[in-house]
């Protein structure tokens, strides 16, 4: 009787690698500059000067807007047909393709998986206001395709003629990571050879600020110190700060990458998706299923808990969330103490895009063998037993890393990466 190979990377699963990245954040319009500024202890969180802050007297007046608009990078026809998220995803996908060396691929084997959290909800509100003011004729015949949740992924699929599937995970703050996880799964199952994957998110707007603020426990109101407001793992943390972003990566089989002499940045080795089944907006305080996602991603990568040298933490800066994640990490990795980084301290929280942003940061940490410092960590919470990198960058021998993403609704995603 023949024994089937174990379903892990390097045995039954093919090796998958990262060969391109593109990102725009509140710090910079590209991944490399964002990375350099993070290593230099810089923050993208600033005072917001949007008119709606004063109009609605919002209690949160800080956040991180992007440093660019996309309109001038698109044609008049594209602008007429695309909503904001489609514009972002299209521009990022073009940058990604260039970063990856403008590869010639079999489009029948190319897929797209791009998540979003809040999507185009605000644009729908604005369209409704127009219709109330000017009647049905105010609504464009292109409205549905511009604002449908899968629009950003669909636009990229059409741009690159992808025919191996187009996916749009909508799982709150885990959407970007879940999109990458699904892409990896499709590749190792033989459904695709390459994937454009990641996450995009809408602009900082009034209703999301108001909605999260009304919850009172999740958003920081340290308006007098924007850069110091988000304090992951700190004893005195009081919530997250919004920071706009979008991020995409190209992943493909190692065989495909080698065949075209691609510049390989890292390995993507395992991914796991679980759910808490606990509460709509609060994580399971024990971190049970989040920990299982981490452990499962490590197992699928063909690794042991002791192999993990670095964890890019979801760590939004809330009291309950950071503590639950610390428990999840410790449950999954046993006695191992990897170097932990919390990028939302510098970039803010980009909801549906953030998992993709932080996946790229994990790739860059493995590529450059250095981890940026977590900002604003003055007094580590005594209940959090983690080795959090703070103060200055930490060089090291980082072979394998895990990126965590968790979202409202009990979504948990963990992705295991390896240096190349």
Swiss-Prot record:
Function of the molecule: Part of the mycobacterial fatty acid elongation system FAS-II, which is involved in mycolic acid biosynthesis. Catalyzes the elongation of long chain acyl-ACP substrates by the addition of two carbons from malonyl-ACP to an acyl acceptor. Involved in extension of the mycolate chains to full lengths and produces longer chain multiunsaturated hydrocarbons averaging 54 carbons in length.
GO biological process, one term: fatty acid biosynthetic process
Source organism superkingdom: Bacteria
Pathway assignment: Lipid metabolism; mycolic acid biosynthesis
UniProt name for this protein: 3-oxoacyl-[acyl-carrier-protein] synthase 2
E.C. code: 2.3.1.294
Record keywords: Acyltransferase, Cytoplasm, Fatty acid biosynthesis, Fatty acid metabolism, Lipid biosynthesis, Lipid metabolism, Transferase
Top-tier EC class: transferase
Protein family per UniProt: Belongs to the thiolase-like superfamily. Beta-ketoacyl-ACP synthases family.
GO cellular component terms attached to this protein's record: cytosol
Subcellular location: Cytoplasm
Active-site positions on this chain: 173 (for beta-ketoacyl synthase activity), 314 (for beta-ketoacyl synthase activity), 349 (for beta-ketoacyl synthase activity)
InterPro entries (alphabetical): Beta-ketoacyl_synthase, Ketoacyl_synth_C, Ketoacyl_synth_N, PKS_Beta-ketoAc_synthase_dom, Thiolase-like
Species per Swiss-Prot/TrEMBL record: Mycobacterium leprae (strain TN)
Pfam family, one: ketoacyl-synt
Catalytic activity of the protein: an ultra-long-chain di-unsaturated fatty acyl-[ACP] + malonyl-[ACP] + H(+) = a 3-oxo-ultra-long-chain di-unsaturated fatty acyl-[ACP] + holo-[ACP] + CO2
Primary location class: cytoplasm
Disulfide bonding pattern of the chain: none
Residues covered by the Ketosynthase family 3 (KS3) domain: 13-419
Molecular functions per Gene Ontology: 3-oxoacyl-[acyl-carrier-protein] synthase activity
């Amino acid at each position: 009787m023949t024994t089937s190979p174990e379903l892990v990377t390097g045995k039954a699963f093919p090796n998958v690698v990262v060969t391109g990245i593109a990102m725009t954040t509140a710090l910079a319009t590209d991944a490399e500059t964002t990375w350099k500024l993070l290593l230099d202890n810089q923050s993208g969180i600033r005072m917001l000067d949007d008119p709606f802050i004063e109009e609605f007297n919002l209690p949160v007046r800080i956040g991180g807007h992007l440093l660019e608009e996309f309109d001038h990078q698109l044609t008049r026809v594209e602008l007429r047909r695309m909503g904001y998220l489609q514009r972002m995803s299209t521009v990022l996908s073009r940058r990604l393709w260039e970063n990856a060396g403008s590869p010639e691929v079999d489009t029948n084997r190319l897929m797209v998986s791009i998540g979003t959290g809040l999507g185009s909800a605000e644009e729908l509100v604005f369209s409704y206001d127009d219709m109330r003011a000017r009647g049905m004729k105010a609504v464009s015949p292109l409205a549905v395709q511009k604002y449908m949740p899968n629009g950003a992924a669909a636009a990229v699929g059409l741009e690159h003629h992808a025919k191996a599937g187009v996916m749009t995970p909508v799982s709150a703050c885990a959407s970007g990571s879940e999109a990458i996880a699904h892409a990896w799964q499709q590749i190792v199952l033989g459904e695709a050879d390459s994937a454009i994957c990641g996450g995009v998110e809408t602009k900082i707007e009034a209703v999301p600020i108001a909605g999260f603020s009304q919850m009172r426990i999740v958003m920081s109101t340290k308006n007098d110190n924007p850069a110091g407001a988000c304090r992951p793992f700190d004893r005195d943390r009081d919530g997250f700060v919004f920071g706009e972003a979008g991020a995409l990566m190209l992943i493909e089989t190692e065989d495909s990458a080698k065949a075209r002499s691609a510049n390989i940045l890292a390995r993507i080795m395992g991914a796991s998706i679980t759910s808490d089944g606990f509460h709509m907006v609060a994580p399971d305080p024990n971190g049970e299923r989040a920990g299982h996602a981490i452990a499962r991603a490590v197992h699928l990568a063909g690794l042991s808990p002791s192999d993990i040298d670095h964890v890019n933490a979801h760590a939004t800066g809330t009291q309950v969330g950071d503590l639950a994640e610390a428990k999840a990490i410790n449950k999954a990795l046993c006695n191992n103490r990897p170097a932990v980084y919390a990028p939302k301290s510098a970039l803010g929280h980009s909801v549906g895009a953030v998992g993709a942003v932080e996946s790229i940061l994990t790739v860059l940490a493995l590529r450059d063998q250095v981890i940026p410092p977590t900002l604003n960590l003055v007094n580590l919470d005594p209940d959090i037993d983690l080795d959090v990198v703070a103060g200055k960058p930490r060089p090291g021998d980082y072979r394998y890393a895990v990126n965590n993403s968790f979202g409202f609704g009990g979504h948990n995603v963990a992705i295991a990466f390896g240096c190349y």
